[in-house]
C-alpha cells in the first residue's frame, strides 16, 4: 500500500478527469489517496474509505495584489505530506503544480517523491511564454519522474524547452465501466432525432484552438448530402461565434447546442461520428471516449491525435483546415454501413488494446515503484 497525494485542476477538463479516475483506480487497489486541490474534483462522485480530500485555502491579504495560490498549495502539500506520511506527490501539469510540489518537498520533514504528468497546455501554450519557460523547465528537471500523455508531447517538450529529463509516455485512458456502447434510442427521441438521421458529435471547451467553426462547416457539407444532426457539447469563448455561424448557414434545425454535459457516454452511444478538428491536441481524450463507445472519429493530423486515431481503420486523419476532405470522409463512412461497422468495431478493439485502464494503471504502478526504489 502506497500513500499518494494527487493534485490536478478539479474542474471539467481532460487532465482533471484522468487524475481523478487514476486516484479512484489506485484506491480500488488498496492504496491511500489524498487529493490536494482548490475544490473537490468533480469526478470524485462517491465515497471511498481510502480517498481523502484536502482543500487548498487561499488567504486574501491586502499586501498581495493577487491571491498566492501556488504558495498556498505548496504549504498545504507539505502539511499533508508530514501529517499523512505521503510517499509520492503526483501532480498534473508542470505549471504551477510541479513547482508547488518541489517547494513542498523542500518544506516537508517527511521524505516525498514528486511525479509530474504533462498534459499539454503547460507546454504548448505556456511553454511559448518566456516568463514561464524557465519555470516550467525547472519543474520538469527537478521532478523525480516525469510522464507525458503522448510521444508528440514528449517531442514538443524537448524541442521547446530543451529539457534533458527522461520523460516516459503513459497514455490517457477512460473508465470502461462508464464508457461503453448501449442502446439509448429514447435519448434520440428526446432530442427529436429521427431514426433515419445520422448523429455527428463534437465535444470540447469551445476555445479557438478547437476550431469549432471547421466542425460546423464540415457538418454543413455532410448535411447537404445526407440526413444528419450535429450535437455540440461543451461551452466556452467560441460558443457565441459558433451559434452565429450556424444561423448564417441556416443550420439551426440541424445543430443542437447542448452546453456542458455529464452524460457524455450516453451522448456518444447515440452518435455515429466524432469530429475533432483542433489545431493542437496533446492526446484528445474525447477521441478515446468515442472509440470506447464504438464511434469512428475524424481528427486533424496534429499533436497526439495520430497516436489515438488509426487512419483508415478506426477513423480518418485530415490536414488542419481541410474541411472538404473531412466532410468527404464523413459522408463515405455514414453512407457505407458495412465500412462504418468495421470502423466501429475496430475503434473499440484499438482502444482496448492500446489504452485500457488496467494497462495504464500497471504502468503508473511500475513508475511509482521505480521512483520509491531510488
Locate the predicted segments by residue.
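N-terminal strand-loop element at the rim of the active site
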Residues: 6-13, 24-69
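Carbohydrate-associated surface elements
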Residues: 152, 173
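A short helix/loop element that forms part of the nucleotide-sugar donor recognition site in Leloir-type
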Residues: 180-193
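Conserved donor-binding/catalytic core segment of Leloir-type glycosyltransferases
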Residues: 194-210, 216-219
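Nucleotide-activated donor-binding/catalytic signature segment of Leloir-type glycosyltransferases, i.e.
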Residues: 243-259
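Aromatic "clamp/platform" in nucleotide-sugar-dependent glycosyltransferases that forms part
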Residues: 260, 279
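Short hydrophobic beta-strand element within catalytic cores of glycosyltransferases
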Residues: 296-299, 309
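Conserved acidic donor-binding segment of nucleotide-sugar-dependent glycosyltransferases
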Residues: 311-312, 316-323, 332-337
Amino acid at each position: 500500500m502506497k500513500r499518494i497525494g494527487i493534485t490536478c485542476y478539479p474542474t471539467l477538463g481532460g487532465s482533471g478527469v484522468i487524475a481523478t479516475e487514476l486516484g479512484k483506480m489506485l484506491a480500488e487497489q488498496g492504496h491511500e489517496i489524498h487529493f490536494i486541490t482548490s475544490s473537490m474534483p468533480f469526478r470524485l462522485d462517491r465515497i471511498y474509505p481510502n480517498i481523502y480530500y484536502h482543500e487548498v485555502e487561499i488567504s486574501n491579504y491586502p499586501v498581495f495584489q493577487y491571491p498566492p495560490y501556488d504558495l498556498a498549495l505548496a504549504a498545504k502539500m507539505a502539511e499533508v505530506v508530514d501529517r499523512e506520511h505521503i510517499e509520492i506527490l503526483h501532480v498534473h501539469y508542470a505549471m504551477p503544480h510541479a513547482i508547488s510540489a518541489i517547494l513542498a518537498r523542500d518544506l516537508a520533514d517527511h521524505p516525498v517523491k514528486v511525479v509530474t504528468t504533462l498534459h499539454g497546455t503547460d507546454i504548448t501554450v505556456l511553454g511559448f511564454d518566456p516568463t514561464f519557460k524557465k519555470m516550467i523547465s525547472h519543474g520538469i528537471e527537478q521532478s523525480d519522474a516525469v510522464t507525458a500523455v503522448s510521444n508528440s508531447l514528449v517531442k514538443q517538450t524537448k524541442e521547446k524547452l530543451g529539457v534533458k529529463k527522461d520523460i516516459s509516455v503513459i497514455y490517457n485512458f477512460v473508465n470502461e465501466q462508464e464508457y461503453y456502447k448501449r442502446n439509448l434510442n429514447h435519448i434520440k427521441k428526446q432530442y427529436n432525432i429521427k431514426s433515419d438521421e445520422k448523429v455527428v458529435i463534437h465535444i470540447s471547451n469551445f476555445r479557438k484552438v478547437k476550431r469549432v467553426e471547421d466542425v460546423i462547416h464540415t457538418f454543413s457539407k455532410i448535411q447537404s448530402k445526407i440526413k444528419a444532426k450535429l450535437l455540440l457539447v461543451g461551452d466556452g469563448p467560441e460558443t457565441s461565434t459558433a451559434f452565429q455561424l450556424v444561423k448564417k448557414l441556416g443550420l439551426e434545425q440541424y445543430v443542437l447546442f447542448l452546453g456542458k454535459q455529464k452524460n457524455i457516454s450516453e451522448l456518444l452511444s447515440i452518435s455515429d461520428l466524432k469530429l475533432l478538428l483542433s489545431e493542437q491536441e496533446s492526446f484528445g481524450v474525447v477521441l478515446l471516449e468515442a472509440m470506447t463507445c464504438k464511434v469512428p472519429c475524424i481528427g486533424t493530423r496534429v499533436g497526439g491525435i495520430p497516436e489515438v486515431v488509426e487512419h483508415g481503420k478506426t477513423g480518418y486523419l485530415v490536414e488542419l483546415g481541410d474541411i472538404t476532405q473531412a466532410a468527404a470522409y464523413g459522408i463515405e463512412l455514414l453512407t457505407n454501413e458495412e465500412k462504418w461497422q468495421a470502423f466501429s468495431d475496430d475503434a473499440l478493439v484499438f482502444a482496448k488494446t492500446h489504452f485500457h485502464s488496467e494497462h495504464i494503471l500497471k504502468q503508473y504502478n511500475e513508475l511509482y515503484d521505480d521512483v520509491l526504489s531510488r
